[in-house]
C-alpha cells in the first residue's frame, strides 16, 4: 500500500491538465504509441470539439521511480470550468494529493484559486507545477511568486515542465512519488468503497468508479449498496489504464471500476458506500454535499412521441452527472417536458447537446431562470424556479433574488472595463486587492445577471485575461417583475421571463423585436406584445401577406375597388379570429439571446 499514490490534476481552463495527463500516460506506458492521441482522456466527442474537459476521468499507471521501486499511480483528470466544479470536488474526495497546474505565462487565475482552496479544505497535499515553460511569454519566477502571494503555497521549488514537449515530465513523476502521501486504510477491516462516479452502459448496466478505503473487493463477491441495502454480485472488476482492463481484485487505496449487473439507474448513487453483504462495515463513508442547481430551464421534446425516450435519457444522464436535477413539467404551448436544474449556462448547453447527440432527441429549451424567494401577503415563503409559477402581483409581498459572490482576477490594465461591467450588471463592490499586476475583485452580483452572459462579456471586455469564480451568497429583496409575451392577445407561458423592473422595458422591447424576425408572416397581422400584468410595455407587428385584389380593375369606378378592398378586409378579420399562429423553434431561442448583442 505504501507504493500507491492517488492524486487529481486541478487547474484553470486551458492550463494544460489534459495534455499533462497524456504525457504521464505516455511516460508510464499506459497506452502504446499507436493508441495515443492528443487529450486521450477527453473521450466524449463534445469534449474534443470544444477542447474542454467535462467529465473527470481516472487512470491507473505503473511507474518505476529512480529509487528502483515500482509505484502505482491512480490519477484523475478534472474539468476546469466553474460549471463543473462539482466534478472536481468529487474527484478530490478520492485522493490524498493534488497537482496544481499553473500556466507559466498566464499565472494564477480565479479557478486555480477556487479548486486549490477546495483541495486544501479536504486536507490534501497540494503540489504546484508550472506548465508551458517552453512558451516565449513564460515567466516562471513571476508566476511562482504569484502562487505564493495569491494562493499562499510555497512555490519556490515548484516543478517546472512543458506538457506539450514532454520537458520535465520525469521530474513531475518523481515529485508525485516524493510529495504525495500514500493512502491510509486497513486491508483487514470490513470493506468500505466510495462510489466516485458512475455511468450507464447499454450492455453492462451501471458501471461504478470506486475508491477502496478499507478492505478489498474481488470478482464474484456479494456486495451491498449501503443506502438501499440491496445486494449484488460483482460480475467484473478492473482498472483504467485509460483502456478498461479486467482484474480479479481491488485492494485498499486503489481506484477502479466495478460492474454488478445493476440495471436500475438509481441502484448505486454517486457518493454511496459499497461493502460486503456478509461481515460488512456498519457505517457509511461521508459522501459528497449535494449541489444546488443555480439555473433552471424547461426542456421539451419537439415531438410528443419522444417523451418516454426523453425521460429515460435524462435518467441515464443524471446517473453520470449527479448535479443535474429534473422534474416533470407541462406547458400549454409546448406540451409535456421537464424542468431541469443546471450549475450554469455552459452546463445547460452541454447537457442539451449530449441529450440531442447521445440519445438522438430534438429539444426546445425555454428561457433560463434562477430560483427566487417569494414572500406572499399571508407570510408564506415560496421558492420559484419558473416564471409561470410566480403568483399574481396582488398576492406578492416581496420577491428576493439570489446574490452571487463573484471573485474576479484581472490584470490592472483592464480593471476599468471590468468594474463598469460589474456596475452595469447591478453589482456591489465588496473588496479589491492588488497583487503585483493582478487585481483581485470581489463583487456581489445578482445570480440572474451572472448566469446569463456575464462570463462571455467579462472575457470580451478583458480580452480573455479576466477570470471568474462565483458561488451563491444570500437572497436579497429586489424589484423583480414578470414580463409576459402575448401573441395576438394570448399569453404564451413558455416565453415569460422574470427581470428587474429597471430593465423590463428594454428587455421587453428587445424581445418583441427579436420575435418579429422569427415568426413567419401569415394571412393576417400578428401582434407581439410584452406586458407586465395588464400593462403593455412593448409591441411589434408581423405584417400580413395580402393579395392585390384590385389588380383586375382596369380604371373603372372607385366604389368597385372600395367594395373589393372592404371584402378582403372582412375576410382577414374573420381569419384573425380563428387563425392560429405556429411558433417556430427559433422564436423560443430568441429569448436566450436577448441582451447579448
Swiss-Prot record:
Keyword Signal listed? The answer is: no
Broad EC category? hydrolase
Which parts pass through the membrane?
A: none
Q: Which InterPro entries match?
A: EF-4, EFG_III/V, EFG_V-like, EFTu-like_2, G_TR_CS, LepA_C_sf, LepA_CTD, LepA_IV
The Gene Ontology biological process annotation of the record reads: positive regulation of translation
User: Which amino acids does the record list as binding GTP?
Assistant: 14-19, 131-134
Task: Write out the catalysed reaction.
Answer: GTP + H2O = GDP + phosphate + H(+)
Q: Does the keyword Chaperone apply?
A: no
Q: Which of UniProt's keywords are assigned here?
A: Cell inner membrane, Cell membrane, GTP-binding, Hydrolase, Membrane, Nucleotide-binding, Protein biosynthesis
Q: One GO term of the cellular component aspect?
A: plasma membrane
The UniProt entry, under Pfam families, shows: EFG_C (PF00679), GTP_EFTU (PF00009), GTP_EFTU_D2 (PF03144), LepA_C (PF06421)
Q: Name one GO molecular function term.
A: ribosome binding
> Which EC numbers characterise this protein's activity in its record?
3.6.5.n1
Q: Which PROSITE patterns match?
A: G_TR_1, G_TR_2
Q: What does this protein do?
A: Required for accurate and efficient protein synthesis under certain stress conditions. May act as a fidelity factor of the translation reaction, by catalyzing a one-codon backward translocation of tRNAs on improperly translocated ribosomes. Back-translocation proceeds from a post-translocation (POST) complex to a pre-translocation (PRE) complex, thus giving elongation factor G a second chance to translocate the tRNAs correctly. Binds to ribosomes in a GTP-dependent manner.
Q: NCBIfam families given for it? A: lepA, small_GTP
Identify the PANTHER family for this entry. Answer: TRANSLATION FACTOR GUF1 HOMOLOG, CHLOROPLASTIC (PTHR43512:SF4), TRANSLATION FACTOR GUF1-RELATED (PTHR43512)
* Homology family: Belongs to the TRAFAC class translation factor GTPase superfamily. Classic translation factor GTPase family. LepA subfamily.
Tell me the HAMAP family matching this sequence: LepA
Query: What is the protein's name according to its record?
Result: Elongation factor 4
**Species whose genome carries this gene:** Aliivibrio fischeri (strain MJ11) (Vibrio fischeri)
Amino acid at each position: 500500500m505504501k507504493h500507491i499514490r492517488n492524486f487529481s490534476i486541478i487547474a484553470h481552463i486551458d492550463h494544460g491538465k489534459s495534455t499533462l495527463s497524456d504525457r504521464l500516460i505516455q511516460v508510464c506506458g499506459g497506452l502504446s504509441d499507436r493508441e495515443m492521441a492528443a487529450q486521450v482522456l477527453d473521450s466524449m466527442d463534445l469534449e474534443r470539439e470544444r477542447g474542454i474537459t467535462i467529465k473527470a476521468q481516472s487512470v491507473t499507471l505503473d511507474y518505476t521511480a529512480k529509487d528502483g521501486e515500482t509505484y502505482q499511480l491512480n490519477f484523475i483528470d478534472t474539468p476546469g470550468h466553474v460549471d463543473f466544479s462539482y466534478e472536481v470536488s468529487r474527484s478530490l474526495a478520492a485522493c490524498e494529493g493534488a497537482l496544481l497546474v499553473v500556466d507559466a505565462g498566464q499565472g494564477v487565475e480565479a479557478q486555480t484559486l477556487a479548486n486549490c482552496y477546495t483541495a486544501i479544505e479536504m486536507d490534501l497535499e497540494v503540489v504546484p507545477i508550472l506548465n508551458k515553460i517552453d512558451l516565449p511569454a513564460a515567466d516562471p519566477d513571476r508566476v511562482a511568486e504569484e502562487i505564493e502571494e495569491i494562493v499562499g503555497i510555497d512555490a519556490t521549488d515548484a516543478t517546472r515542465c512543458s506538457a506539450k514537449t514532454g520537458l520535465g515530465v520525469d521530474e513531475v513523476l518523481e515529485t508525485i512519488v516524493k510529495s504525495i502521501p500514500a493512502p491510509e486504510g486497513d486491508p483487514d477491516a470490513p470493506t468500505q468503497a466510495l462510489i466516485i462516479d458512475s455511468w450507464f452502459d447499454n450492455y453492462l448496466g451501471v458501471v461504478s468508479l470506486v475508491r477502496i478505503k478499507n478492505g478489498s473487493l474481488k470478482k464474484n463477491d456479494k456486495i451491498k449498496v449501503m443506502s438501499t441495502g440491496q445486494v449484488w454480485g460483482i460480475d467484473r472488476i478492473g482498472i483504467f489504464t485509460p483502456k478498461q482492463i479486467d482484474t480479479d481484485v481491488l485492494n485498499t487505496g486503489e481506484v477502479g471500476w466495478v460492474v454488478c449487473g445493476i440495471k436500475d439507474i438509481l441502484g448505486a448513487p454517486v457518493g454511496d458506500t459499497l461493502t460486503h453483504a456478509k461481515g460488512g462495515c456498519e457505517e457509511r463513508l461521508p459522501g459528497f454535499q449535494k449541489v444546488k442547481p443555480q439555473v433552471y430551464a424547461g426542456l421539451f421534446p419537439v415531438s410528443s412521441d419522444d417523451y418516454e425516450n426523453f425521460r429515460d435519457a435524462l435518467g441515464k444522464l443524471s446517473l453520470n452527472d449527479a448535479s443535474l436535477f429534473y422534474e416533470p413539467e407541462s406547458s400549454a404551448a409546448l406540451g409535456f417536458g421537464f424542468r431541469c436544474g443546471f450549475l450554469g449556462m455552459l452546463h445547460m448547453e452541454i447537457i442539451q447537446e449530449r441529450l440531442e447527440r447521445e440519445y438522438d432527441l430534438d429539444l426546445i429549451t425555454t428561457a433560463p431562470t434562477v430560483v427566487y424567494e417569494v414572500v406572499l401577503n399571508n407570510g408564506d415563503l415560496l421558492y420559484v424556479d419558473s416564471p409561470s409559477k410566480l403568483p399574481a402581483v396582488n398576492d406578492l409581498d416581496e420577491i428576493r433574488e439570489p446574490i452571487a459572490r463573484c471573485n474576479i482576477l484581472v490584470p490592472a490594465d483592464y480593471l476599468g472595463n471590468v468594474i463598469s461591467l460589474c456596475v452595469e450588471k447591478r453589482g456591489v463592490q465588496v473588496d479589491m486587492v492588488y497583487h503585483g499586476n493582478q487585481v483581485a475583485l470581489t463583487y456581489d452580483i445578482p445570480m440572474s445577471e451572472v448566469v446569463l452572459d456575464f462570463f462571455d462579456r467579462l472575457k470580451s471586455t478583458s480580452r480573455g485575461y479576466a477570470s471568474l469564480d462565483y458561488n451563491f451568497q444570500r437572497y436579497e429583496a429586489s424589484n423583480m417583475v414578470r414580463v409576459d409575451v402575448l401573441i395576438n392577445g394570448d399569453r404564451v407561458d413558455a416565453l415569460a421571463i422574470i427581470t428587474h423592473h429597471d430593465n423590463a422595458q428594454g428587455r421587453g422591447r428587445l424581445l418583441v423585436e427579436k420575435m418579429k424576425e422569427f415568426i413567419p408572416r401569415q394571412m393576417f397581422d400578428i401582434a407581439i406584445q410584452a406586458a407586465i400584468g395588464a400593462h403593455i410595455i412593448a409591441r411589434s407587428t408581423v405584417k400580413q401577406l395580402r393579395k392585390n385584389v384590385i389588380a383586375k380593375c382596369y380604371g373603372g369606378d372607385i366604389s368597385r375597388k372600395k367594395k373589393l378592398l372592404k371584402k378582403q378586409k372582412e375576410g382577414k378579420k374573420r381569419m384573425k379570429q380563428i387563425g392560429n399562429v405556429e411558433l417556430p423553434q427559433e422564436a423560443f431561442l430568441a429569448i436566450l439571446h436577448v441582451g447579448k448583442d
